[in-house]
């Protein structure tokens, strides 16, 4: 009986990850915005919803295309914040959010060389791009890095989902 339960949980987890992967890739294809795509995939998969959050994430790929914090990190941390965070000012309960969020950042940086867009881009193609510059943005698209970002969005969402599904991070 325990074996069947473990298999059902594993299958459910695998199904969740597969659906999440498909959503993350599709949303990035539609929007071209890694922050919105990662948040939207996680939000839809875990019922976190809120179109205002998606709207607020508009300028966050690389922090306004400056090569700074990767939009996938921001979108994923926003989703984790909705799961683990507090909505009242003045409470110190928000500190509980740091543990799962730091775990996400460690895992993401471990796989992609850092949490900055420039770190990820350099790891994918050996150099960085100024995506606010139209010529460099075109070069970025032509090198195929944009397509590789789809893999990063999907993996970033999986890292966040693994944390959300992990018992040791269950919200109180």
Regions inferred by a protein language model and the residue ranges of each:
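Acidic-glycine-rich active-site phosphate/pyrophosphate-binding loop
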Residues: 9-14, 41-58, 127-134
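Polybasic, low-complexity association/targeting segments
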Residues: 2-28
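C-terminal binding/interaction regions
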Residues: 99-172
């Amino acid at each position: 009986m325990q074996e069947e339960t473990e298999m059902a949980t594993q299958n459910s987890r695998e199904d969740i990850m597969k659906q999440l992967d498909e959503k993350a890739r599709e949303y990035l294809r539609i929007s071209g915005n890694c922050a919105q795509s990662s948040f939207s995939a996680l939000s839809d998969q875990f019922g976190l919803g809120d179109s205002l959050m998606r709207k607020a994430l508009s300028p966050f790929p690389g922090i306004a295309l400056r090569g700074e914090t990767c939009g996938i990190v921001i979108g994923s941390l926003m989703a984790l914040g909705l799961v683990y965070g507090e909505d009242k000012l003045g409470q110190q309960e928000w500190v509980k959010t740091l543990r799962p969020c730091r775990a996400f950042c460690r895992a993401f940086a471990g796989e992609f060389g850092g949490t900055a867009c420039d770190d990820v881009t350099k790891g994918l193609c050996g150099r960085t791009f100024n995506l606010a510059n139209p010529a460099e943005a075109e070069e970025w698209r032509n090198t195929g890095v944009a397509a590789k970002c789809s893999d990063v969005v999907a993996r970033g969402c999986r890292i966040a989902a693994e944390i959300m599904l992990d018992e040791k991070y269950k919200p109180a």
